[in-house]
Amino acid sequence: MEAAERRVISVIVINEASVLSRITDLFSGRGYNITSLTVAPIPESRYSRLTIVTSGSVRVIEQITKQLHKLIPVLKVIEHADLVEKEMALVKFPITENLADISALCSAYNGNIVNVSEEVIITMVADEPKRVDYFLSAIKRFHPKEIVRSGAVALER
């Protein structure tokens, strides 16, 4: 049995109602898991780009891409081999935590403090998914109150 590999697939679609539903139905109907899904319109066009992170054997990934190609609003499917991939995380900390230490840690992970109020500090980091994992592990000592993480975005090199 082949090992499941993490894969990033971009799908260019016509930006119309129910496209996202059809794509997620394709995955769920066949028992494939979507680890991360990000969708945004492509500027100055009537298209959107979906970035899907999934996992599966080579055969499963081939099946997914073939099925995606068959969907009517799909214009292009890109299975990334050599890519730049980023994720973002917003983290809320109590104001009682050390601002300088949090700022230094954020800087090490392509991030910064984006908001400070009387009660909380909000930070943002944007980096490779593994580095976002490391950041989220490293910040535990600052007692984060809330963490929100985006899905992946990717471009072929």
Predicted features and spans:
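Long, contiguous binding/interaction regions
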Residues: 1-48, 53-157
